[in-house]
């Protein structure tokens, strides 16, 4: 077994001992330590092209861009094979899959044993967060996938910078990953919060294999945050600059397919001249209390791992600019001459394509050319609207926290919480509608507290209690809001135009955070009222706006019944203040119905 480059570029005994131990288990032919340099990126890319792991795109149209298609059984996160391995099942809680740690190490160890024979073991040191920030966390991912190593080079600050930050410390996340035989029957993603360790085997897909992303930055980090008194959240961070030059920062949590990246990269409508929205982050926020008593946030990532289908110049021009160079496209469709396409792109599909499975595809086919979860991995620095503070080690001060799900009924366009506890209640009960295929029942609400349901690294009730406990740590807390861009008319049409016009709602929230906008008190929270939103230049009827902001008491009685079932699922660790918030709202709704 050989080791390169420069043999071992660290003298950290903790790290060297662990790498040796993992090499002994996985038995690679060669160990390669990544340094994060441009020369290395070119060399690894050439290796990946030679091995047909990557296919170069037309370098005139897509400079520095490459295409990858995964195994057809390996296209998304696998929640049912994702485990939290805590000493007791209660510590993982009722919303996570649990495996006893010794059993998990034994079970996965048997799969890892010899899994890298004939392969290179890449040692990928990386930092989540600006490398000089007190927020920063170091991880080391060992992987047998050059695709993973190259993606980690985009998504995190990778290589020498991480080893320099680590020094001789033992405080690093130990991540072991092998594609192994990519067998769904031998696929496990296991998190060991007490050991600051992640073992992932049998998948090469982003969320399962890029261990810095969901695994460390949310599941492990949420556990560390609970113990250390901060928040690791599934939230975008955006900077809003007014025409007068005032800058405010918000963090927003939306579940998948609810427009997080679009909101983070929003372009204000023509009716808002002089306003600028810049991206600090599009997916993850780490937040700590600053010396001034405010909540400060950093984006731990260094790139965007975005869903391609539906992304176009209308929905997200900044994302389209971000992927123009040095991007890896996974499971989109491509043309034989090195162009790419996906459903929802600005132009119609070409007559013939190679689909995401590598098969010929003709226009008019009922099959999707690009996989619905096909992705782009793009460097954050490509974003023309990136915030200049994206690498600031202090982070940015958060004025508002926004929660939002996808609800066709019930939840109005925007609400401001009465207080922190009420805001945590709104976040704890947020969710999105699904179709229950077995019953054909449409509109079943999948609760997704703070958009974190698949990513909480410990018991959900304890996580919500941590949110409540944070109030005493934040002398100057941000205001909390709930939004719903997705309410529909009786005919099934969206009532609110969304996209850039969400700026109108954002402006009201920013003004409320600054203490300069009026609001109307309702039984659900504060709302803008009839005149609170700036609607000039908006081609939407007054009736549609009224319907988007309406509070229907009958719908809320049903909603509170559904919330009761959700709270029962959380069991005995559900914080009593959240149950009380539900009970108080139910009383307000019933009292209002009697008055009516």
Swiss-Prot record:
Cofactor: Mn(2+)
GO CC, alphabetical: cytosol
CDD domains named among the record's database cross-references: PEPCK_GTP
SUPFAM superfamilies membership: PEP carboxykinase N-terminal domain (SSF68923), PEP carboxykinase-like (SSF53795)
Protein EC: 4.1.1.32
Binding site for substrate: 77, 205-207, 256, 373-375
Annotated compartments: Cytoplasm
GO biological process, one term: response to lipid
Ranges in a coiled coil: none
Cofactor, how bound (note): Binds 1 Mn(2+) ion per subunit.
Pathway: Carbohydrate biosynthesis; gluconeogenesis
Keywords: Cytoplasm, Decarboxylase, Gluconeogenesis, GTP-binding, Lyase, Manganese, Metal-binding, Nucleotide-binding
Active site location: 258
Keyword Membrane: no
Catalytic reaction annotation: oxaloacetate + GTP = phosphoenolpyruvate + GDP + CO2
Entries under Gene3D superfamilies matching the protein: 3.90.228.20, Phosphoenolpyruvate Carboxykinase, domain 1, Phosphoenolpyruvate Carboxykinase, domain 2
Residue pairs linked by disulfide bridges in the UniProt entry: none
Pfam families: PEPCK_GTP (PF00821), PEPCK_N (PF17297)
Region of interest (Disordered), residue spans: 362-388
A GO molecular-function annotation: phosphoenolpyruvate carboxykinase (GTP) activity
Residues the entry annotates as binding Mn(2+): 214, 234, 283
Binding residues annotated for GTP, in chain numbering: 257-262, 375, 406, 499-502
Cited function: Catalyzes the conversion of oxaloacetate (OAA) to phosphoenolpyruvate (PEP), the rate-limiting step in the metabolic pathway that produces glucose from lactate and other precursors derived from the citric acid cycle.
Record text on subunit structure and interactions: Monomer.
Family named by the database record: Belongs to the phosphoenolpyruvate carboxykinase [GTP] family.
The protein's name: Phosphoenolpyruvate carboxykinase [GTP]
Originating organism: Anaeromyxobacter sp. (strain K)
């Amino acid at each position: 077994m050989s080791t390169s480059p420069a043999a071992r570029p660290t003298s950290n005994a903790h790290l060297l001992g662990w790498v040796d131990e993992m090499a002994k288990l996985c038995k690679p032919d060669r160990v390669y330590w990544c340094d994060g340099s441009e020369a290395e990126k070119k060399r690894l890319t050439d290796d990946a092209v030679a091995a047909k792991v990557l296919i170069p795109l037309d370098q005139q149209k897509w400079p520095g861009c490459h295409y990858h298609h995964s195994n057809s059984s390996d296209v998304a996160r696998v929640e049912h094979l994702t485990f939290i391995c805590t000493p007791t099942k209660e510590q993982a809680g009722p919303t996570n899959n649990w495996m006893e740690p010794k059993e998990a190490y034994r079970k996965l160890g048997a799969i890892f044993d010899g899994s890298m024979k004939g392969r290179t073991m890449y040692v990928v040191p990386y930092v989540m967060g600006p490398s000089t920030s007190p927020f920063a966390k170091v991880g080391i991912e060992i992987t047998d996938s050059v695709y993973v190593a190259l993606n980690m080079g985009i998504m995190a600050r990778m290589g020498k910078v991480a080893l320099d930050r680590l020094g001789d410390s033992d405080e690093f996340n130990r991540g072991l990953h092998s594609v192994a035989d990519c067998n769904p029957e031998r696929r496990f993603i296991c998190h060991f919060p007490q050991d600051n360790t992640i073992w992932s085997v049998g998948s090469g897909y982003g969320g399962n294999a890029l261990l810095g992303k969901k695994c460390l930055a949310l599941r492990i980090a949420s556990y560390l945050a609970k113990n250390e008194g901060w928040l690791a959240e599934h939230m975008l961070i955006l900077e809003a600059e007014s025409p007068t030059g005032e800058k405010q920062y918000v963090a927003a949590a939306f579940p998948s397919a609810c427009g997080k990246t679009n909101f983070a990269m929003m372009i204000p409508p023509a009716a808002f001249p002089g306003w600028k929205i810049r991206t600090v982050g599009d997916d993850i926020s780490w937040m700590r209390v600053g010396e001034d008593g405010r909540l400060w946030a950093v984006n731990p990532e260094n790139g965007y791992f975005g869903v391609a289908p539906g992304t176009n110049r209308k929905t997200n021009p900044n994302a389209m600019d971000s992927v123009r160079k040095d991007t890896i496209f996974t499971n989109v469709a491509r043309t034989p001459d090195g162009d790419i396409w996906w459903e929802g792109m600005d132009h119609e599909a070409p007559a013939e394509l190679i689909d995401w499975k590598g098969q010929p595809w003709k226009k008019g086919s009922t099959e999707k050319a690009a996989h619905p979860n096909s992705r782009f991995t793009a460097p954050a620095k490509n974003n023309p609207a990136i915030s200049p503070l994206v690498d600031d080690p202090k982070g940015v001060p958060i004025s508002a926290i926004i929660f939002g799900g996808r609800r066709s009924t019930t939840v109005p366009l925007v609400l401001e919480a009465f207080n922190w506890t009420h805001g945590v209640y709104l976040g704890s009960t947020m969710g999105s509608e699904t179709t229950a295929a077995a019953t054909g029942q449409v509109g079943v609400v999948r609760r997704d507290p703070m958009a974190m349901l698949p990513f909480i690294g410990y018991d959900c009730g304890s996580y919500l209690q941590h949110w409540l406990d944070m109030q005493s740590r934040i002398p100057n807390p941000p205001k909390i809001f709930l939004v719903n861009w997705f309410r529909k008319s009786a005919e099934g049409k969206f009532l609110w135009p969304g996209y850039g016009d969400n700026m109108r709602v954002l402006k009201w929230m920013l003004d409320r955070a600054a203490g300069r906008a009026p609001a109307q008190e309702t039984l659900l929270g504060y709302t803008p009222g009839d005149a609170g939103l700036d609607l000039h230049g908006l081609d939407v009827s007054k009736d549609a706006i009224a319907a988007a902001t309406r509070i229907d008491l009958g719908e809320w009685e049903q909603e509170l019944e559904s919330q009761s079932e959700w709270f029962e699922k959380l069991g005995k660790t559900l914080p009593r203040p959240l149950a009380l918030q539900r009970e108080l709202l139910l009383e307000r709704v019933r009292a209002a119905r009697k008055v009516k």
